[in-house]
Amino acid sequence: MPEGGDNYLTPADDQMTMIATALGEPETGKQLIAEVDQAFEQAAAAHPGWKGKTFTAATKTADGWGAYVGGSDRVTFMQNLGFTQNPTIAAMQPDATGFSTSLSAENLDSIDADVVVAFPIFVPTAQLTGDPAFAAVPAVQQNRAVIIDGDLAQAYSLGTTTATQYAIGQLVPKLEQAIGS
């Protein structure tokens, strides 16, 4: 993390540039960034119907529910596919993490969007899918929620070039199933 940087808020491209430069391979870093950019561009071009559709990136932890706000690579990932962040979530202030906001079960309906990408963190997926408040969200009721876990959730969250390419390849078909092209 650069001096004065915020934990978990250094953009993926900046991370790759710093790492590649430190390893004496700045051109390799530029190439990897270009490959990710191209993968996003191709996926977005193949799904013009996603442009402007709203999304929420949500998570269930042992502490409860949360949603990612601007500054998170999880938000940027979806924006790179053409989606627009759910304005209700976008207007919320981040908590101490700087990149997410906590949500009570009573306010969980605020995650409703054209598509919801949700994943568990350090809890079984069943705690997410079995939560009655989550099941009551319209996007969930209408099968417009994509639940990810395991390697895909890790890749979606990690933000490295290799992880992002994997996540694009795995998540795009799931988004297609949820909301079409």
Regions found by a protein language model. Give the residues of each.
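Short, catalytically relevant binding-site loops at active-site mouths
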Residues: 61-65, 94
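Structured C-terminal subdomain patch of bacterial secreted/periplasmic proteins
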Residues: 111-181
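N-terminal post-signal-peptidase region of extra-cytosolic proteins
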Residues: 96-104, 130
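Alpha-helical, coiled-coil/dimerization segments enriched in small aliphatic residues
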Residues: 69-99, 152
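Short helices/loops that flank or line small-molecule/ion binding pockets
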Residues: 102-112
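General small-molecule cofactor/ligand-binding pocket signal
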Residues: 56, 86, 145-147
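Extracytoplasmic substrate-binding proteins
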Residues: 1-62, 157-181
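Short secondary-structure boundary/capping segments
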Residues: 47, 75, 136-137
